[in-house]
Amino acid sequence: MTIGRTILVVADACGVGEAPDAARYGDLGAATVPHVAEAVGGLDMYTCGRLGLGNIVPVEGVPPAAPPRACFGKLAEKSAGKDSTSGHWEMAGVIVDKPFPVFPRGFPRELVQEFERRSGVGVIGNVATSGTEIIQKLGFAHLETKALILYTSADSVFQLAAHERLYPPERLYEICQIARELLQGEYGVGRVIARPFEGEPGNFRRTRNRRDFSLVPPHDTILDLFTKHNLRTVGIGKIGDLFAGRGLTDKVKTENNRDVAGALIQAVEETDYDLIFANFVDFDELHGHRNNAIGFARALEDFDLAMEEVVEEMRPDDMLIITADHGCDPTMTSSTDHTREYVPLLVYGRQLASGIDLGTRETFADIAATIADARGLPHQFPGRSFMKDITP
């Protein structure tokens, strides 16, 4: 059996329960989607429910389907991390054995000085903190001095915030590219992130012009495999940033989940891409990191409506895979960090089997192996394909 198009959808940060090694990451008890459902008294997710979301784990308001329209299971992350880069790379076939470096006390002085020398711009801050908080705290000083606001977090990130009046987004992106070229080896953070903001003192707010500058994957991903076989790929949302553009025929820039949904539905309706890879980021960026369970719940319900349209527009030989890259449990208010969790796995296609329990998978890389097998492409991805399980 050969699949036509694969539609890979990542509900960013939508974990479904603590991973076996959650204690190592300080995440015992995390369960993003189930806890969000509990916090609002239940979710209205008819489409994902019919596909089998409630068959993976108990989710209030989403009962187990009998039988589910999709095959279902959950995946554990094998990579050393709980960030978007390692999560997406792993599902694309690259396991990160060594965690990306983190800098909880800020970046070394000599590194910052070299960045200032190369970029020609000074920095202030250089602390691990919340991005929304630091622009309120240092925004006025930034306007006065024109120094960029540098900060990091519990993730492996080098973030540069700048007011768009002083540094238009394209200029900030140029500076971030300089940082990306510098930050390699022992300082090779997973992502350099441009964080433009606007407003006046006391009312600074981020704009939607964020851009991520990822490391380049060390090995070929499923995207590279497709393009090497002259198959067309498109990345929607932050996919292009996470893979440094590699292996993508086209990229669609979006600002929020609504944009992603529109671009995804259009791609499914109108295009002949062989692999459509989309990331819905709002769960993470707007809700998980801000401990906003109510907003997270509403975003999940909107996501479900988008999935309804995707399912309706799928062609007979399409394969839809819905998953996540990590958790970010907004009910764990002692932290705003990502959480080490299992992620959901829903696999649907009109010509595929339905109602098959795919079990607990050992690595996200099972997705890459399956997508390759679905197109009959030879590969050496570390995952274990479930293509035979979903073939009638």
Where are these regions (language model features)?
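Feature captures the catalytic ectodomains and active-site-proximal regions of enzymes
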Residues: 1-392
